[in-house]
């Protein structure tokens, strides 16, 4: 039995390769790659995702973070075009043509990747794809190894994001049990959160409150906690504070490097 040789590269050669720098859709927050935004049902994840899509399509800042103008595809798989229209009017009177919506799509291993790649071919300026929700594109089955299934599914989407140098954001749910580490509350196995480039958890301390914390962690971003407040009139999550900007204490600075 022949063994395939490892494809290695020495450190000196690696340092001499002029790789293209990482591109950010939202500066310091959402780079190219695969990302997961999780929150409890009806907490306001979709409002946040829609506003993010608008900001990216218009090239307007998301809170204090600059965005890179790009075309955006938002797969709203739990909504209708009528509901999306209503929400758009709540957010803006001038929605850009660079923001695209779909309410139906194939499942992950049954044509979804091909559908997205066809869209990217027709819209080469696309920088962000949002899938709302992750569960809608996954087949229902009784996997013997849920971790392997989660990791495999996420791997397909990560490969898509890396291949086209775009950001793909998956909207997902939290498990009901509380945990001191918000990332442990992401529904599913660690095969989901472990295979993504970034994870975001939107969490309220009490269900009826308008305030929440967005916990942000990833391979290419600093860990930060964004305190947010939902405005019931504008339907926008407003930024109250950013843990990376609060204090000049050495420990806080190191935490955000």
Where are these regions (language model features)?
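Pre-Walker A (Motif I) flank of P-loop NTPase domains
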Residues: 31-35, 70
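Conserved inter-motif catalytic segment of the P-loop NTP-binding fold
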Residues: 2-7, 12-14, 19-21, 25-26, ...
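Phosphate-binding/switch region of NTP-binding enzymes
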Residues: 21-24, 36-38, 42, 46-47, ...
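Gly/Ala-rich phosphate-binding loop of Rossmann-like dinucleotide-binding domains
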Residues: 57
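Conserved phosphate/pyrophosphate-binding and hydrolysis machinery centered on Walker-type P-loop NTPases
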Residues: 143-147, 186, 247-248
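Short alpha-helical segments that sit at the start of domains
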Residues: 238-257
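Hydrophobic positions on the alpha1 helix immediately C-terminal to the Walker A/P-loop
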Residues: 48, 52
């Amino acid at each position: 039995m022949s063994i395939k040789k490892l494809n290695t590269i020495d450190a000196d050669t690696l340092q001499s390769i002029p790789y293209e720098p990482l591109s950010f859709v939202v500066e310091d927050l959402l780079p190219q790659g695969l990302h997961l935004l999780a929150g409890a049902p009806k907490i306001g994840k979709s409002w946040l995702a829609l506003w993010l899509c608008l900001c990216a399509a218009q090239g307007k800042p998301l809170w204090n973070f600059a965005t890179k103008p790009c075309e955006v595809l938002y797969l709203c798989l739990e909504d209708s075009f009528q509901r999306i229209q209503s929400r758009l009017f709540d957010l803006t009177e001038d929605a850009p043509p660079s923001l695209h919506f779909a309410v139906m799509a194939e499942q992950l291993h049954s044509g979804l990747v091909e559908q997205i790649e066809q869209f990217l071919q027709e819209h080469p300026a696309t920088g962000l794809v949002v899938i709302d929700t992750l569960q809608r594109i996954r087949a229902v089955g009784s996997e013997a190894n849920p971790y392997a299934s989660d990791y495999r599914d996420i791997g397909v989407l990560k490969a898509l994001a890396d291949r086209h140098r775009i950001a793909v954001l998956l909207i997902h749910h939290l498990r009901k049990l509380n945990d001191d580490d918000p990332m442990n509350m992401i529904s599913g196995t660690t095969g989901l959160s472990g295979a993504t480039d970034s994870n975001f958890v939107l969490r309220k301390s009490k269900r009826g409150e308008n305030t929440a914390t967005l916990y942000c962690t990833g391979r290419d971003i600093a860990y930060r906690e964004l305190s947010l407040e939902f405005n019931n009139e504008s339907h926008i999550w407003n930024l109250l504070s950013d843990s990376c900007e609060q204090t000049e204490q050495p420990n806080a600075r190191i935490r955000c490097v």
